[in-house]
Swiss-Prot record:
Family classification: Belongs to the transaldolase family. Type 1 subfamily.
Annotated catalysed reactions: D-sedoheptulose 7-phosphate + D-glyceraldehyde 3-phosphate = D-erythrose 4-phosphate + beta-D-fructose 6-phosphate
Active site residues of this protein: K133
UniProt-listed SUPFAM superfamilies: Aldolase
Pathway(s) it belongs to: Carbohydrate degradation; pentose phosphate pathway; D-glyceraldehyde 3-phosphate and beta-D-fructose 6-phosphate from D-ribose 5-phosphate and D-xylulose 5-phosphate (non-oxidative stage): step 2/3
A GO molecular-function annotation: transaldolase activity
Protein name (record): Probable transaldolase
Main localization category: cytoplasm
Subcellular location: Cytoplasm
UniProt-listed InterPro entries: Aldolase_TIM (IPR013785), TAL/FSA (IPR001585), Transaldolase_1 (IPR004730), Transaldolase_AS (IPR018225)
Purpose: Transaldolase is important for the balance of metabolites in the pentose-phosphate pathway.
Subunit structure of this chain's protein: Homodimer.
PROSITE patterns: TRANSALDOLASE_1 (PS01054), TRANSALDOLASE_2 (PS00958)
């Protein structure tokens, strides 16, 4: 019998937002997204101890590295180990995140992206199956532009505004991950409300606007809605190129009726009020981002949170080196 999850898959590529292998097998996800927070959670589970042990062994076999370089390589190798295992389960791609503390450094982002791809190659994984995740700062987008020209595909995350999305599209990145739930959180707090009806949810509307803008202007960059707070938000975005959904919401969709899902986003039926191409020059990008209180705040907050979880993971690994 069909359910809401199966129905959603008819219109949208469903991606599991998890580093838990059991979950990936259960829901038949096409791709998987990971981030420092998810890997930190998974790495605390004894069943993934072998992946940590392998990363430590890999680093200890290298000579001439400083303590800082050892730690950095161990984290990268651990992320790649998770990615390699995930790719044994999903038929598509895995997203692996660059250190959030590099979000304002073009060269460091490019270097880290290349290093992660080299580790995947060493493990026998083709770069076509990997997306390098970068924050949607000006520097992150510029780094993605360089990596994409080298054939390294990128997923621009922590994206909260049309200006960030437009800059990514002009940079010809493979995929963007506009966040829904964190936008919802911001406006719930600001307006002092308990929640929004899905069709009027500011986070949902943001993704709808980005999707329509990309399709109107013929951009090839895929839109993958991310960061959902309830199943209704995902249902309202049926038809989006991809949606990355957490395990608890995948379960809710699996248990919900298929009749709840109809195609909401359609590239052949776009609204009439889509803006012309935005000015994505450096100065205008910074101004537009600064002028959007929510996007400015949430981008910075998201970078800090990912950095915080990465430090926790580093502290865990440091004891083993």
């Amino acid at each position: 019998m069909s359910n809401a999850l199966e129905e959603l898959k008819k219109y949208t590529t469903v991606v599991a937002d998890t580093a838990d292998f059991d979950v990936l097998s259960k829901y038949g996800s096409q791709d998987s997204t990971t981030n420092p927070s998810l890997v930190f959670q998974a790495a605390s589970d004894p069943k993934y101890k072998s992946l940590i042990d392998d990363a430590i062994k890999y680093v200890n076999a290298k000579s001439g590295l400083s303590e800082k370089e050892k730690l950095s390589l161990a984290i990268d190798k651990l992320f790649v180990n998770f990615g390699v295992e995930i790719l044994k389960i999903v038929p598509g791609r895995v997203s692996t995140e660059v250190d959030a503390r590099l979000s304002y450094d073009i060269d460091a982002n490019v270097k880290k992206g290349r290093e992660l791809i080299a580790l995947y190659k060493e493990a026998g994984i083709d770069k076509e199956r990997v997306l390098i995740k970068l924050a949607s700062t000006w520097e992150g987008i510029e780094a993605a532009k360089i990596l994409e020209k080298e054939g390294i595909h990128c997923n621009l995350t922590l994206l909260f505004s049309l200006i960030q999305a437009a800059a990514c599209a002009e940079a010809q990145v493979t995929l963007i991950s506009p966040f829904v739930g964190r936008i919802t959180d911001f406006y719930k707090s600001k307006q002092g409300v308990a929640g929004f009806e899905a069709s009027k949810d500011p986070g949902v509307i943001s993704v709808q606007q980005i999707y329509s803008y990309f399709k109107k202007h013929g951009y090839k960059t895929s839109v993958m809605g991310a960061s959902f707070r309830n199943k209704e938000q995902t249902i309202e975005l049926a038809g989006c190129d991809l949606l990355t959904i957490s395990p608890n919401l995948l379960e809710e969709l699996k248990n919900a009726d298929a009749s709840l899902v109809t195609k909401k986003l359609d590239s052949t039926k776009l609204p009439s009020d889509i803006p012309n191409k935005l000015d994505v020059s450096h100065s205008n990008f910074l101004w537009e981002l600064n002028d959007n209180e929510m996007a400015y705040f949430k981008t910075g907050e998201g970078i800090r949170k990912f950095a915080e979880d990465l430090v926790k993971l580093e502290n865990q690994i440091k004891k083993l080196l």
